[in-house]
Amino acid sequence: MAQGTVKWFNAEKGFGFISTENGQDVFAHFSAIQTNGFKTLEEGQKVAFDVEEGQRGPQAVNITKLA
């Protein structure tokens, strides 16, 4: 499982990007966030996730927020 930092996330549109520890940007969709309630991420938030190859490049799945 990779770790990274939320680069930006638009809660209204439900997507954004996560910067990995090696500097790669990975697409993040709200449906991949593993939490109850409103699924959103905050800029600068630390997260853990798996990476899958999506239609438009690397995509984060199984996103969990780190304390």
UniProtKB/Swiss-Prot annotation:
Coiled-coil parts of chain: none
Gene Ontology molecular function, alphabetical: DNA binding
Entry-linked Pfam families: CSD (PF00313)
Cellular component terms per the entry's GO annotation: cytoplasm
Location in the cell: Cytoplasm
PROSITE patterns, per the entry: CSD_1, CSD_2
InterPro entries reported for this sequence: Cold_shock_CspA (IPR012156), Cold_shock_domain (IPR050181), CSD (IPR011129), CSD_CS (IPR019844), CSP_DNA-bd (IPR002059), NA-bd_OB-fold (IPR012340)
Cytoplasm listed as a keyword: yes
Keyword ATP-binding recorded: no
Induction: In response to low temperature.
Superkingdom of the source species: Bacteria
Main localisation: cytoplasm
Residues covered by the CSD domain: 4-63
Keyword list, A-Z: Activator, Cytoplasm, DNA-binding, Stress response, Transcription, Transcription regulation
Subunit field text: Homodimer.
PANTHER family per the UniProt record, alphabetical: COLD SHOCK DOMAIN CONTAINING PROTEINS
Protein name: Major cold shock protein
